[in-house]
């Protein structure tokens, strides 16, 4: 039968596996052989090494080499004594010797060390004395033995006297003792020779070893490695060789001279020793009394310490020999004090033996446990998760418990309904099936508590107390964790990776779903946690701090986006920062404050520059060199053929190709794709030229385009800001000022064509579109601009860019949008993705006849003669979004005309071109007398309800012109027009309703002012509130522009005069205001006087008719009462008694 003790070959181990059902491998066998070589015991089950001397456990040979400090067994002289020497020797008899001498020989030689036993006749009779053993003596010469007497001859018995016999006995004893001493000496020499031979390598190693101190304080020899010894031997051999080659011959030195001078002893000057002026230290060694305990004292000490540990629930460590130790702590379970030992499974290790308690330490652990609930009886149902390491009395447990081998039972876990002892060795299958009773919640709480206390703030000014319930605190902490992270388990790594991959918007959306419910839950169930509510509200405010007012951003860009001079440049930068909302960084917010400061300085010291320009001197030549595109030159973004690598951008570009491109089927030919129609006309693509003719004549004919009529250079070709040309937004001209006309553009397949200057750049379409031909749908040719911008977008931002372009830009642009809207959309995208501002655009052609922009794709154009737009980058194209830009092309459609193109999506702001305003008779800002006639129109409509209703319907913002004159504003307020405007437009136009409310408030304040100067100051102060309302988009109507101009003039006037008024100066404009007010009041007063006369006539006629009717049907008493009432009513109406109807009126009534 195979056993592991006689396992010398691998097949022995396999035979043992088959017999016992074990699974030992070759690795176990190798470790078993290694343990035999170093003299260790190998435990096959636990796969560990055990030292037979110190009983220490090691898991690998490296651990033995680094940590094993056990001393080897000492040698003894008995180890080298022969086995024969250890045998018991016969005791010689030293009594009288009777020697029988045969007759043949008179003299016989005695041999005490013969191998054959002596004859029974020859005996030594001695009592109580033993000198040594009678073993065989190692000798080379044989010892002659006494011959046996022959039977034939009779033996002679010699009787000697007693004295002679005694003397002979003494001589024999001396000889025997001398022989014994020689034997002992020989054996001793032999033993020491063997000892020297065995210790010679060890002693020779100590000659080169050094003495080192171990951790326990013992001094040991530390031998040097073999390579160091070899180097030392080689060096010694070299020195000996040199000594043999150049032997040293000693000589007597009788004179030493240093540089020919006197000897050193003569030149040396004797120096006096320095005097010590300090008191020497007197360090006295302190001798501590050594603590000595007997067994009784030691037990009492352990009892006292155990009581303290269990009561205070402190941690302790019982240390034994070398590295033997047991760690535990005091705890309470069901109100009983217990000892809880530190086990391996609580640290995350699953081992067959969970804890090893040395036999020498087990009584101490039991003694400490006895100070608690040692004598309490426990059942298995009282143990649950969290009970790991509890030390119980093995004789006091009842129920389903596993094997109990020791007096103490350490709880490990439960398997198959039984509670297992941590000291027991279990199989690997049980180890993995066992439900460990470690306290996961306690581990979490220990980590939380430790880190919480370690990071406690140091600047708390009060003493912290326990006011909240701990369970309620845990509930609120769980709510916060699930609100912010939303994990299925806090230990789940997949949830963490999923949370990490969320974008900023997705994360905000995810948190916003839960944060409202959490706030309501805390308010209702945990109202004391107000600090948590404040934190959640702050988080919600930060997450929702988005600026979705893209309309205001668009309007700002349209108004002043192209202005590069101060303060408009600061406003543009501020607008770009504000639109980011919560995505703006702290540095950007600091920059925003600086821009506000610059705007404030400008408003304080305002200046204006007048620029002039003329078409006669207009030149807008395009560069002959190609535009430098860094994205197409970076080696990291090019393949081995120099082509552009789309990377992740290729996948996200599908959002453009799927919705706004049409797949071309070459099998049906290209004829149906040749005509590119728009609402106002059409253009021929060069897609048919993809079928290339090899005939030179035919090929040359295909290179001839179809030209259209050239309108020449007109105001439609240029864009101005004031009188300054904005060249990127103008058509390209030659050096003589004539517009440059487009030529035929040859087609290509699967490319995106970029560049407006020099040679075009061909970029391969994304791999997602590989093998297919795409053409944009009608009305969506501007998608090529967004596709060109995608080239410069970083790969990790491609998803956000394409989603924003599709869901925000394209959704609002729709089909055939205006160039202003396209430029605004590009600016919004460039704000969130600044790298796209340098993106190179496809070539854009201008068709003034149909007021259309053509974005040329890879299929070119056969139609020629179009003007060429100079804008080559997104930054230059964005200038079309500025409202201050005076340009007809600003309102051209990218594929159609405003009156024939489909309606724009909801949310777009209606705009009118400058030429359209002139056609409608609208006066521009720079024309004189633009406010006065409209103010007169407002004054006429004050007391004409129908005219006022018509005015509010057509030009509602003319009401703001009333702030020019306090009298006009008061009349407008008294007429009730402001009140009617407020109520009528409350549902339809809240902006206009708010304007009427502000004017009503200003009228009330003006009515309380006593002087005209104060009234004008009140009106100028209220201009700021009206300006805030006018900043919202309101179109290009006449009333809006006039109101905006009037408010800005009043604000600027107030700001300029503020410093003078503050120091007490008065400006000359006060007299001017009096003249203006008098002139307006004169016209307005005449109208009021005429209205008063008409009112008197109507009122007298009405009273006369009433009086006649009453007199004809009343008695005299009632007539007199009626006369008094008529007089009183006249006084109330006219505030003068002489204006009341008198007796003539009554007399005429009586006569009638």
UniProtKB/Swiss-Prot annotation:
PROSITE patterns: HC_PRO_CPD, PV_P1_PRO. The keyword Protease applies. The record marks 437-438, 895-896 as: Cleavage. InterPro entries: HC-pro, HC_PRO_CPD_dom, HC_PRO_CPD_sf, Pept_S30_P1_potyvir, Potyvirid-P3. It comes from the Viruses. The keyword Nucleotidyltransferase does not apply. The active site is at residues 345, 354, 388, 781, 854. Residues 773-895 form the Peptidase C6 domain. A motif (Involved in interaction with stylet and aphid transmission) lies at residues 489-492. Keywords: Host cell junction, Host-virus interaction, Hydrolase, Inhibition of host innate immune response by virus, Protease, Serine protease, Suppressor of RNA silencing, Transport, Viral immunoevasion, Viral movement protein. One of its GO terms (biological process) is viral translational frameshifting. GO terms for cellular component: host cell plasmodesma. One of its GO terms (molecular function) is cysteine-type endopeptidase activity. Potyviral RNA is expressed as two polyproteins which undergo post-translational proteolytic processing. Genome polyprotein is processed by NIa-pro, P1 and HC-pro proteinases resulting in the production of at least ten individual proteins. P3N-PIPO is cleaved by P1 and HC-pro proteinases resulting in the production of three individual proteins. The P1 proteinase and the HC-pro cleave only their respective C-termini autocatalytically. Residues 292-437 form the Peptidase S30 domain. Belongs to the potyviridae P3N-PIPO polyprotein family. The N-terminus of helper component proteinase is involved in interaction with stylets. The central part is involved in interaction with virions and the C-terminus is involved in cell-to cell movement of the virus. This is P3N-PIPO polyprotein. It comes from Lettuce mosaic virus (strain 0 / isolate French) (LMV).
């Amino acid at each position: 039968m195979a056993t592991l003790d006689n396992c010398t070959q691998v097949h022995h181990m396999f035979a043992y596996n088959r017999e016992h059902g074990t699974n030992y491998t070759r690795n176990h066998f190798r470790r078993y052989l290694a343990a035999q070589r170093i003299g260790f015991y190998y435990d096959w089950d636990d796969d560990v090494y055990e030292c037979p001397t110190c009983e220490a456990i090691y898991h690998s040979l490296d651990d033995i080499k680094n940590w094993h400090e056990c001393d080897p067994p000492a040698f003894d002289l008995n180890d080298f004594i022969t086995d024969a020497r250890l045998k018991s020797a016969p005791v010689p008899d030293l009594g009288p010797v009777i020697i029988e001498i045969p007759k043949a020989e008179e003299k016989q030689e005695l041999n005490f060390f013969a191998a054959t036993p002596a004859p029974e006749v020859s005996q030594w009779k001695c009592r109580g004395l033993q000198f040594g053993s009678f073993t065989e003596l190692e000798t080379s010469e044989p010892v002659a033995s006494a011959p046996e007497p022959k039977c034939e001859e009779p033996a002679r018995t010699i009787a000697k006297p007693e004295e002679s016999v005694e003397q002979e006995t003494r001589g024999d004893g001396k000889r025997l003792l001398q022989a014994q001493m020689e034997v002992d000496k020989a054996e001793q020499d032999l033993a020491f020779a063997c000892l020297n031979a065995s210790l010679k390598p060890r002693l020779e190693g100590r000659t080169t070893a050094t003495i080192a101190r171990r951790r326990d304080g013992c001094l040991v020899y530390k031998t040097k490695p073999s390579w160091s010894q070899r180097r030392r031997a080689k060096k010694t051999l070299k020195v000996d060789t040199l000594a043999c080659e150049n032997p040293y011959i000693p000589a007597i030195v009788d004179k030493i001279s240093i540089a020919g001078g006197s000897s050193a002893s003569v030149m040396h000057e004797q120096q006096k020793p320095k005097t010590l002026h300090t008191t020497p230290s007197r360090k006295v060694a302190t001798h501590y009394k050594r603590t000595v305990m007997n067994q009784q004292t030691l037990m009492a000490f352990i009892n006292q310490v155990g009581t303290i540990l269990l009561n205070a629930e402190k941690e302790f460590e019982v240390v034994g020999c070398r590295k033997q130790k047991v760690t535990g702590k005091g705890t309470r379970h069901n109100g009983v004090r217990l000892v809880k030992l530190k086990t391996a499974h609580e640290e995350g290790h699953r081992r067959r033996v969970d804890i090893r308690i040395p036999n020498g330490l087990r009584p101490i652990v039991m003694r400490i446990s006895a100070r608690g609930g040692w004598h309490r009886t426990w059942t298995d149902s009282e143990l649950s998760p969290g009970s790991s390491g509890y030390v119980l009395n093995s004789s006091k447990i009842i129920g389903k418990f596993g094997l109990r081998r020791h007096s103490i039972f350490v709880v490990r876990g439960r398997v198959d309904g039984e509670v297992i002892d941590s000291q027991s060795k279990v199989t690997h299958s049980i180890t993995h099936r066992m439900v460990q009773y470690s306290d996961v919640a306690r581990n979490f709480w220990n980590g939380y508590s430790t880190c919480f206390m370690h990071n406690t703030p140091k600047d708390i000014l009060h003493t912290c107390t326990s006011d909240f319930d701990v369970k309620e605190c845990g509930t609120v902490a769980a709510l916060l964790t699930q609100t912010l992270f939303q994990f299925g388990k806090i230990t789940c790594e997949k949830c963490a990776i999923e949370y990490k991959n969320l974008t900023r918007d997705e994360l905000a959306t995810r948190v916003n779903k839960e944060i409202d419910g959490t706030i309501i839950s805390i308010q209702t169930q945990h109202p004391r946690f107000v600090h948590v509510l404040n934190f959640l509200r702050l988080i919600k405010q930060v997450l929702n701090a988005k600026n979705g007012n893209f309309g205001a951003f668009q309007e700002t860009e349209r108004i002043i986006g192209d202005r590069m001079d101060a303060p408009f440049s600061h406003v543009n930068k501020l607008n770009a920062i504000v639109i980011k909302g919560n995505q703006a960084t702290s540095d950007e917010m600091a920059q925003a404050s600086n821009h506000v400061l610059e705007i404030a300085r400008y408003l304080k010291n305002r200046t204006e520059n007048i620029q002039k320009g003329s078409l006669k001197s207009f030149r807008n030549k395009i560069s002959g060199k190609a535009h430098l595109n860094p994205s197409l030159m970076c080696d990291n973004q090019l393949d081995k053929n120099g082509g552009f690598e789309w990377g992740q951008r290729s996948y996200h570009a599908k959002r453009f190709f799927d919705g706004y491109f049409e797949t071309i089927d070459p099998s049906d030919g290209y004829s149906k794709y040749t005509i590119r129609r728009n609402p106002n006309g059409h253009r021929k693509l060069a897609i048919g030229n993809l079928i290339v003719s090899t005939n030179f004549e035919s090929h040359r004919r295909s290179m001839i385009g179809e030209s259209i009529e050239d309108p020449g250079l007109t105001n439609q070709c240029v864009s101005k800001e004031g009188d300054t040309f904005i060249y990127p937004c103008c058509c390209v001209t030659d050096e003589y000022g004539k517009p440059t006309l487009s030529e035929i553009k040859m087609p290509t397949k699967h490319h995106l064509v970029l560049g407006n200057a020099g040679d075009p750049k061909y970029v391969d379409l994304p791999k997602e579109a590989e093998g297919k031909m795409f053409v944009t749908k009608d009305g969506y040719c501007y998608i090529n601009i967004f596709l060109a911008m995608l080239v410069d977008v970083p790969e990790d931002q491609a998803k956000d860019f394409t989603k924003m372009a599709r869901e925000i830009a394209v959704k609002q642009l729709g089909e055939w949008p205006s160039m202003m809207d396209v430029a605004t959309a590009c600016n919004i995208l460039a704000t969130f993705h600044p790298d796209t501002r340098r993106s190179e655009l496809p070539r854009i052609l201008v068709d003034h006849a149909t007021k259309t922009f053509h974005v040329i794709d890879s299929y070119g154009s056969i139609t020629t003669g179009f003007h060429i737009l100079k804008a080559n980058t997104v930054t230059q194209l964005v200038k079309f979004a500025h409202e201050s830009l005076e340009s007809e092309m600003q309102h051209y459609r990218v594929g159609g005309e405003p009156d024939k193109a489909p309606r724009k999506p909801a949310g777009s702001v209606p705009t009118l071109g400058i030429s359209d305003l002139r056609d409608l008779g609208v006066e521009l800002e720079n024309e004189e007398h633009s406010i006065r006639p409209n103010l007169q129109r407002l004054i006429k409509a004050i007391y004409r309800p129908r005219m006022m209703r018509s005015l509010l319907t057509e030009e509602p913002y003319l009401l703001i012109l009333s702030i020019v004159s306090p009298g006009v504003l008061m009349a407008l307020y008294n007429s009730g027009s402001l009140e009617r405007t407020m109520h009528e437009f409350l549902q339809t136009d809240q902006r206009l309703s708010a304007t009427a409310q502000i004017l009503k408030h200003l009228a009330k304040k003006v009515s309380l002012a006593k002087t005209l100067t104060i009234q004008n100051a009140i009106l100028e102060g209220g201009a700021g509130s009206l300006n805030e309302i006018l900043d919202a988009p309101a179109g290009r109507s006449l009333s809006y522009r006039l109101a905006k101009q009037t408010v800005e003039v009043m604000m600027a006037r107030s700001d300029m005069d503020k410093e003078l008024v503050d120091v007490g100066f008065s400006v000359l404009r006060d007299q001017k205001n009096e003249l203006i007010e008098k002139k307006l009041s004169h016209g307005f007063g005449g109208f009021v006087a005429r209205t008063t006369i008409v009112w008197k006539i109507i009122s007298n006629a009405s009273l006369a008719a009433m009086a006649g009717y009453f007199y004809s049907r009343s008695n005299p008493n009632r007539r007199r009462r009626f006369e008094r009432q008529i007089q009183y009513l006249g006084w109330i109406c006219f505030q003068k008694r002489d204006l009341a109807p008198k007796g003539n009126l009554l007399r005429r009534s009586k006569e009638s």
